Each structure stands twice: as structure tokens, then as C-alpha cells.
Amino acid sequence: MKKTILSIILAVVATVTATAQIKVEVSETVELMSILARTAGYQEYSMDLAGQYTKDTEAWFAPYKEHVAVVLAQDIRAKYGIGHERVMNMAIHLGIDNGKIVLIGDRAELNNGWQNVDLDDFVKRLNKFYKDTRFHEFFEQHRQFYDDYTKMYEANVMPTFHPEWYSQFHYGTAPTDRFHVIINFTCGGNSYGLCSQLSGQPRDLFAIIGYWIDPALGRPRYDASVLFHEANHPFVNPLLDDDKNIKLMEKVGPKLLSLHQSSVEKTNYPDWRIVINESLVRAAVVLYMQDAGYKMEQCLNVLGLEMVQKGFPWMFDLVGTLRYYTAHRDQYKTLNDFYPDIARCLEQYVNDLERKTGKTIN
């Protein structure tokens, strides 16, 4: 009995400590890459929902729309599809050393289009953009603005975030990764979950959360479920890099993509692999909320939103399947071990739908 009580106390202390150690940050390289993308006309970085900060950004950087770095950013978007999380993938692989932008980490992690880019030339032009625009001066002028919001986010959202849940849910182990929560003041309603690995260091997990002002409220809006969502991506996305798992999903994936695209007016997900990953991440958020003690009504609201408005009508089935996984961890040590069951769940959903409608999904 004493051991049980001690274990509970130690678990609570570990949880509080883990959360307390995660400081909400602003990253100069995240803002740099985001503002470069905005100046180059990337739509997903041009939502312009940050009020006065957006106005300041436009006034400061508009004169540089013909800059060599901006022209290159436009070129690599057109040729290689660089955008969305790929921009942020570059951002987390950049550092600033004595006022100079440098690449850090493993270049092989810069894929999905970046492998086709001359990275040395890109960084050279990015340094010129950094210097010519006096970017650091802009960044420091807004330091108080950044700090005020990160403190607000820290106070209101971080107490609901339990990083140890993720390693336990996905791996069945205690946490070994390092979480970073970064506010992106340029990407508006978009947020991203990424990871990187420095040699000899724990894996770094990044939840990059978009800042936006709700026009109806006239103040910044933050939703804790966005953090819960993005924190899952570094665990879920690598599973579909495995050829074995790709083979499991390659038939049902395109059908789910077709269903998703037909159920929403506009989607940011043009590839079936993204839809599979998003499905798992969104289902995991519901389980997280259940395990974190959210009211059933709140969990059902999130589930209903994903099914009806977000274009993932199979979410109810997937949440049930993942709950089976959590109840049988003696059989499935990791989510990767359970991946064949996930594929079967999604296949069953599609088969049932085709049978009910009498139509084949293409």
C-alpha cells in the first residue's frame, strides 16, 4: 500500500515537473522563415490575423518583395511544393550564431522537397535577407509583444498539457524526448507538429502554434486542443514512413482522401498519407482529452467537429479502435504494433459505407 501511494506521488511530481520545464517560446528562426514565406506570397503564411503585428510586418518587409531570398522562396515553392510544415521544418533546422543564420542538425531531415534545393545557396540568400531587412531589429522591437502573449499562453494552456501521456500512449515508455512549444505570430490559424534529432541528444519535438486575433472578440484566441493535436504529429507521422505501414494503407488511403475531399469545401490535405496521419492525430486528441479528465460533452463536441465539419466521418470508429489499443497494452506495446488493426478499422469503415450506399469509392 505504501509503495502504491509513493508511486502515485512520484508520478504526480514527475508530471508537474515535466510540464513546468516546458517554457512557451518565440523563435527568431520560426518568425524569419514565416515572414520570408509571407513576403514571397505563400497563402498559408498570409492569413494576416495578427492585428497590429501584421501591419508592422507588412510595413517593414513589403519593400523587399523582389529580394533574392524572396525570389528563391517563390521558385522552390513552384518547383518543389515547399509550403506549410515544410517551411517550419527548415525553421527548426536553423540557428543563429554571431548574427549569422546557420544550418543545424541532420540535413537528411530536410526532405519533402528540400532535398532538391541547394541548401547552402538558400542559407546564403536567407542571411542576406536577414541582414538587408534588419530582421533582428524588427524581432527585438516586438519582444514585449511576444513575451506578453507567451506568458498568457503559458498560464492558460500549459497546465492542461501532459507531455508524459504521449510517450506512454505511443511507445509505452517514460518520456525521453524534449518538447518545445513555440508560438508562431505569422501563420495565423495554422499550426504544425515536427521533430528533429541532434547527434547525441534526445529527440526534439516541436508544437508550433499559430497566433490569431478573433475578430468577434477583438483579442487573441487560443485553443488547448490545437496543442494536444500538434504534439501527436512527431509520434504519428514517422509511422507512415515505414514501407510496411504504407503497404497496409495504400488501398484504403486514397479512398479516405476522396471521402475527405468530398465532405469539405476546402482542404489543405492533397495526399492520402496526410489524411491517414491527420486521422490518427485527431482520434488521439479525443483519447487524450478523455484521459485528462475532460467532460464527456467536451470530448463528444471535439469528435463531432472532426466528423462533420473537418471531413473525417470515420473518426468515431477510429476512436473506438484506439480505445481498444489502450485497453490491451499487454498485447500492443507501441502504436506501431497496432498499426495493422488501425488499417483494418479504416478498411472496414470504407467497406461498410460502400455496401450501404451501393457505390464504389474511388
Please place each PLM-identified region on the residue numbering.
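N-terminal mature-domain "stem" immediately C-terminal to a signal peptide or N-terminal signal-anchor/transmembrane
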Residues: 21-101, 310-335, 339
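Pan-zinc metallopeptidase signature
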Residues: 283-362
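Post-HEXXH active-site segment of zinc metalloproteases
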Residues: 238-264
